[in-house]
């Protein structure tokens, strides 16, 4: 048996999860015989870039300025469908696409929060949940398998099933950026350990998190297994360390919103747009 430890930061963790999923046995059957619907996130965009050289458009994001959306819609897809070896933008026909999916098909998304009980959730900053709001009833009722790709850095304390009702975009009085609610995601969470264990015959454990001097949001991982399998993972880690240090998302969606923006009409409590009802003393640069 062999044991190895390594650290990956932020984007490298996203690349690792994407690479492991792409090469795993759990993903292959859907590529061959089913439909795979991807919802845009930085981690999922790593996966679609590796799969089909097609980065995705991201919508909401947390930046140094708070919870924001993209400044412009951009031309990239926020929802991509992979079927019969081809990938296409289904933003304009999302509901029809979901109506044609069922058991034997796969939905792949990221998450903004996960807990120790296996629950995951997305931040919702617009009325009805935007594109994910369209997806939710189909994910709960049509037997579509859902994979939730997210780093252990998204782990929060407590139980999301209890927290979700307490976080409300409409009850919030002040927010740096748009106030948000949480929407649950029904499905299977794949963080770094689960992704690694699907990629190679190893046991994987996260044993520390943190970072300094450019390595913020790092994760320390230990793997154990036969030498051949451990070195298989280390070879992949070496490749990941040479990949771009920014997530491969659609360039048109990189810029964050500034007041006024296309989403202002739906966003609530944003202090940058003077929508807060308390604390009117922030400095806007």
Model regions and ranges:
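Conserved phosphate- and dinucleotide-binding cores of soluble alpha/beta proteins
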Residues: 2-4, 8-17, 76-245, 249-271, ...
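Long, charge-rich intrinsically disordered regions
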Residues: 278-279
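N-terminal active-site beta-alpha-beta segment that forms phosphate/nucleotide-binding
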Residues: 2-84
């Amino acid at each position: 048996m062999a044991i190895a430890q390594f650290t990956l930061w932020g984007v490298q963790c996203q690349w690792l999860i994407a690479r492991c999923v792409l090469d795993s046995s759990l993903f292959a059957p859907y590529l061959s015989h089913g439909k795979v619907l991807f919802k845009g996130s930085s981690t999922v965009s790593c996966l679609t870039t590796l799969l089909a050289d097609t980065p995705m458009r991201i919508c909401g994001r947390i930046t140094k300025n708070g919870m924001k959306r993209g400044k412009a819609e951009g031309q990239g897809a926020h929802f991509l469908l992979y079927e019969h070896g081809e990938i296409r933008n289904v933003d304009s026909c999302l509901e029809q696409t979901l109506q044609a999916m069922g058991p034997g098909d796969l939905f792949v998304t990221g998450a903004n929060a996960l807990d120790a009980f296996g629950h995951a959730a997305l931040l919702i900053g617009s009325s009805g949940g935007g594109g994910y709001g369209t997806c939710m009833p189909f994910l709960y009722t049509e037997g579509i398998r859902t994979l939730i790709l997210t780093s252990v850095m998204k782990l929060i304390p407590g139980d999301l099933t209890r927290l979700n009702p307490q976080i409300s975009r409409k009850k919030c009085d002040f927010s740096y950026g748009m106030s948000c609610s949480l929407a649950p995601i029904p499905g299977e969470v794949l963080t770094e350990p689960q992704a690694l264990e699907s990629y190679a015959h190893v046991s994987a454990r996260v044993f520390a998190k943190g970072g300094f001097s450019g390595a913020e949001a790092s994760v320390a991982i230990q793997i154990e297994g036969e030498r051949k399998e451990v070195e298989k993972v280390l070879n992949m880690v070496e490749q990941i360390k040479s990949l771009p240090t920014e997530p491969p998302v659609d360039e048109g969606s990189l810029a964050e919103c500034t007041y006024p923006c296309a989403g202002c009409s739906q966003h609530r409590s944003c202090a940058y747009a003077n929508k807060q009802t308390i604390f009117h003393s922030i400095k806007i640069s």
